[in-house]
Structures are given as structure tokens and as C-alpha cells.
């Protein structure tokens, strides 16, 4: 049985505003 809360993949989105790094968004794909 697989743990449904386990994140198997993560996708990172680097966010830039006016050419400056504004942070990173991490999405967990199950």
C-alpha cells in the first residue's frame, strides 16, 4: 500500500518579476 501523502515528483517554477527573482513555486505531483 502506497502512502498517499508521499510526493513522488516535484516541479519547480522560478518566478521572476521585472527580471528579478521573486521566489520559487513548488508543486507536488502525485
Swiss-Prot record:
It is found in: Microsome; Endoplasmic reticulum. The keyword Nucleotide-binding does not apply. Keywords: Chaperone, Endoplasmic reticulum, Isomerase, Microsome, Rotamase. Inhibited by cyclosporin A (CsA). It catalyses: [protein]-peptidylproline (omega=180) = [protein]-peptidylproline (omega=0). One of its GO terms (cellular component) is intracellular membrane-bounded organelle. Its EC number is 5.2.1.8. Residues 12-30 form the PPIase cyclophilin-type domain. InterPro entries: Cyclophilin-like_dom_sf. One of its GO terms (molecular function) is cyclosporin A binding. Gene3D superfamilies: Cyclophilin-like. It is an enzyme of class 5 (isomerase). PPIases accelerate the folding of proteins. It catalyzes the cis-trans isomerization of proline imidic peptide bonds in oligopeptides. Belongs to the cyclophilin-type PPIase family. Monomer. This is Peptidyl-prolyl cis-trans isomerase, microsomal. It comes from Zea mays. The lineage of its organism: Eukaryota, Viridiplantae, Streptophyta, Embryophyta, Tracheophyta.
